[in-house]
Amino acid sequence: MKILFLACLRAHTGNSTTALRIKDHLEAAGHTCVLKDAAILESSEVETLISQEKFNAGLIIQLYKAGRFLMGNRIPFGAIFGGTDINEDVKNEEKCRVMGAVLEEARFVVAFTHKIKELAATKWPHAKHKIHIQPQGILTKPSKSFDYEAFLQNAGIRHKSGHLHLYVLICGLRRVKDPLYLAEMFAKWHEKEPNVYLAIIGPMVDPVFTKEVENKLEEIDGVYLIKEIPQSDLQAVIKRSFALVNSSLSEGMSAAILEAMDLEVPVLARDIPGNSAIIKHEDTGLLFSTPQEFVQLSKRLMTEPELKRRIVSNAKRYVNSNHSWELERDTYQTLILNLQVNGNI
């Protein structure tokens, strides 16, 4: 099949990473898969694309932002829930209506978690039978040639050899990711313990908010903003870090958290539904509800080696069992067959 795949493709963000991985799964099964950025498309462009390029199937990530472009375009399509669908867009009446119409037309829908399926089935009961649960598959390949010391030096992070505790927070710079949530508390901690640093790594998604972040970080020490870097380099940074941090206001399923688990790096995450769906507190990671609690838990991680060992070991086992890249590949290669002309769910 020739598949038109629509997703919001901001570089080095979760959606982009997920889309590229699924595209690879489909092409491995012999399909032609053309990935387009839904963030910059117009409806008329999609109609022209479908007719000129002779696509016979479609796939989308995010029901509203991408799904609306395939409605009524006469090609069968499948859909994948994004975190924004359930956490944000569902609160808007018009967006919610469009999402319901997309679900009506979609041959199949994928949810990353049972919770997302439950929320969707409650909102759109007519689509319950179409929703398949497939957690994100994780495959990490950290760069072996990455120069970590040069990376730290370029970021302005000065440290004594062997004494650095680097925390990394990976996100596209937008308000929902709340990257400044821990900034002031972390700066106070850094003042007392100069070997702790927080690196916020990611692309400028919201220019206005990015400027706010830059201005804030100019006022404090110990917290650094670093532009996005290639995926393999980013994974090399995670692997050398003391812990990965997530402070988002809402999440679908954070690929960065799962990658850290796979790389055997402990995770400290804000206690929100998207994070607690994949982290069991003090078992596969640590969940915090306030900046003060984050520091308390971080200190425990530093002083209780058995806690760190248990979390890292259990998290690695969890990822291997529940986020298999091979199982994800099998799922999408099977589901996509529902888009053949006479395919049924």
From Swiss-Prot:
InterPro entries per record: Glyco_trans_1, Glycosyltransferase_G1
Keyword Secreted: yes
Compartment(s) where it occurs, according to its Swiss-Prot or TrEMBL record: Secreted
Signal peptide region: 1-19
Keywords noted in UniProt: Glycoprotein, Glycosyltransferase, Secreted, Signal, Transferase
Residues carrying covalently attached carbohydrate according to the record: N246, N322
EC number: 2.4.-.-
Origin: domain of life: Eukaryota
UniProt similarity note: Belongs to the glycosyltransferase group 1 family. Glycosyltransferase 4 subfamily.
UniProt-recorded name of the protein: Glycosyltransferase 1 domain-containing protein 1
Organism: Xenopus tropicalis (Western clawed frog)
